[in-house]
From Swiss-Prot:
Its EC number is 3.6.5.2. Its cofactor is Mg(2+). GO terms for biological process: vesicle-mediated transport. Switch I, switch II and the interswitch regions are characteristic of Rab GTPases and mediate the interactions with Rab downstream effectors. The switch regions undergo conformational changes upon nucleotide binding which drive interaction with specific sets of effector proteins, with most effectors only binding to GTP-bound Rab. Regulated by guanine nucleotide exchange factors (GEFs) which promote the exchange of bound GDP for free GTP. Regulated by GTPase activating proteins (GAPs) which increase the GTP hydrolysis activity. Inhibited by GDP dissociation inhibitors (GDIs). This is Ras-related protein Rab-28. NCBIfam families: small_GTP (TIGR00231). The gene is RAB28. Residues 219-221 form a propeptide. GTP binds at residues 21, 24-27, 38-39, 41, 44, 71, 129-130, 132, 160-161.
């Protein structure tokens, strides 16, 4: 295959990640792009930018430009410009924070406004994050699915902390944008391999109960 033919199989997609500041957008983008989870919360101011190249069926190489938009930009003048030209939009909320789910109406209204003013109609995906905290869930799956059905969103549930379904979410979005259907084997192959950190701690007397600090990692195949 010539260089020009190889280049023709390379695609670039702009994926914009929107949602409230505590929904875990940055952790989601970082987990996908760098396969790590940031344990310390750091609010995104304005815009963060991530890149990752993936391969879809048919040996199609796709570079995803992930635009992590700060939660405070919802009323800002730059938000329209950040969204403009996106092929995909992830609306991210925290499944344990009902307000973060309700606020997606405001985020989506901006997406619709930009779409009407541009020639690009992005694929919109609804992403429920922090499913590792299922016992603290306040947004029922039925609510999530109804919102998807009413607006034609694709549906995803992930955990940026454990890495559960993070890569699969981005892979599915990219494939749907490009009109590529993933088969069951490809989906299963993209599922996260569960791993555990080894936590080292000092020896303590047997009479004392030791609760070492818990650690988490994001591992993506």
């Amino acid at each position: 295959m010539s260089d020009s033919e190889e280049e023709s199989l390379d695609r670039q997609l702009k994926i914009v990640v929107l949602g409230d500041g505590t929904s875990g957008k940055t952790s989601l983008a970082t987990c996908f792009a760098q396969e790590t989870f940031g344990k310390q919360y750091k609010q995104t101011i304005g815009l963060d930018f991530f890149l990752r190249r993936i391969t879809l069926p048919g040996s199609l190489n796709v570079t995803l430009q992930v635009w992590d938009i700060g939660g405070q930009t919802i009323g800002g003048k730059m938000l329209d410009k950040y969204i403009y030209g996106a092929q995909g939009v992830l609306l991210v909320y925290d499944v344990t924070n009902y307000q973060s789910f309700e606020n997606l109406e405001d985020w989506y209204s901006v997406v619709k406004k930009v779409s009407e003013e541009s020639e690009t109609q992005p694929l919109v995906a609804l992403v429920g994050n922090k499913i590792d905290l299922e016992h603290m869930r306040t947004v029922k799956p039925e609510k999530h699915l109804r919102f998807c059905q009413e607006n034609g969103f694709s549906s995803h549930f992930v955990s940026a902390k454990t890495g559960d379904s993070v890569f699969l979410c981005f892979q599915k979005v990219a494939a749907e944008i490009l009109g590529i259907k993933l088969n069951k084997a490809e989906i299963e192959q993209s599922q996260r391999v569960v791993k555990a950190d080894i936590v080292n701690y000092n020896q303590e007397p047997m009479s004392r109960t030791v609760n070492p600090p818990r650690s988490s990692m994001c591992a993506v195949q």
